[in-house]
A protein has these predicted regions:
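Nucleotide-activated chemistry modules centered on ATP-dependent adenylation/adenylyltransferase
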Residues: 1-2, 7-241
Length: 241
């Protein structure tokens, strides 16, 4: 199960803990780009010990050794190399045939095209124009060798749903989501290309009220989404989460 330590990932972790009586039976995967916020790494180390997580940390060391980074490359290239390729490497190394992900349809128009069970080919690519229909609880879950399926239980949750669940269950999350000095992060990614929003929302109640009044995109602060037309769709077609 990919785990970014963001709010959606932590909700999915919490649901897994509840489903399996406090012990997640499958490994969690953190794709470490080496550009993580220090607060996220601190949270990762705390949560791994606190919940007894079997954590796999994957870095695309080959790309980093070639100098791939935000200092020298555009954000779409870096995202593909350090996130998508690293994910493909992890899937191949561990021979996984399924991933449980925390993506949601309301995050981005491209994710709105997704399915609860989303097949990926042997290159982890997503053929969004040729997805199998999913009617009356019938899901496509059989894979050919080398392929995998992405299981996406939060697909129909909204951003406010996520926050209300965090509030109800008192789920620990990184403090970067809460306002400090008039700014907070609404969505978390690599620190060089993730920008905070103007906000005074310092509590979950404040955040929910803020979201109920806003019309701006949740991922407006994520630079790779806006680098070129249809950037997110191109990234996801190649295997990005």
């Amino acid at each position: 199960m990919p785990w970014s330590m963001g709010k959606d990932s932590n909700v999915l972790l919490w649901l897994s803990l509840k489903a399996f009586f406090g012990k997640v039976p499958y490994p969690l995967l953190h794709i470490d780009t080496t550009y993580e916020f220090p607060e996220m790494i601190e949270f990762r180390e705390w949560a791994t010990k606190h919940y007894g997580i079997n954590l796999i940390v994957k870095v695309n060391s080959e790309a980093r050794s070639r100098g791939v980074g935000y200092e020298t490359h555009d954000p779409v290239t870096v995202t593909h190399e350090l996130k998508t390729v690293a994910l493909k490497q992890a899937i191949a190394e561990h021979k996984w045939d399924a991933l449980i992900t925390g993506i949601r349809r309301d995050e981005d128009p491209t994710r709105a095209k997704e399915r609860y069970f989303s097949p990926r080919d042997a290159e982890s690519e997503w053929h969004y124009k040729h997805q199998p229909p999913q009617f009356w609880g019938q899901f496509a879950i059989k894979n050919a060798p080398g392929e995998h399926v992405r299981v996406q239980p939060l697909l129909d949750w909204t951003e406010v749903d996520v926050w209300r669940y965090i509030q109800r269950e008192q789920i620990p999350i990184p403090q970067l989501y809460f306002a400090r000095n008039g700014k907070r992060y609404r969505s978390l990614g690599c620190h060089p290309i993730t920008h905070p929003i103007e906000s005074n929302a310092a509590t979950i109640e404040d955040i929910i009220a803020e979201l109920e009044a806003t019309r701006s995109s949740e991922r407006a602060g994520r630079a790779q989404d806006h680098y070129e037309p249809h950037a997110m769709q191109k990234l996801r077609a190649r295997g990005f989460m």
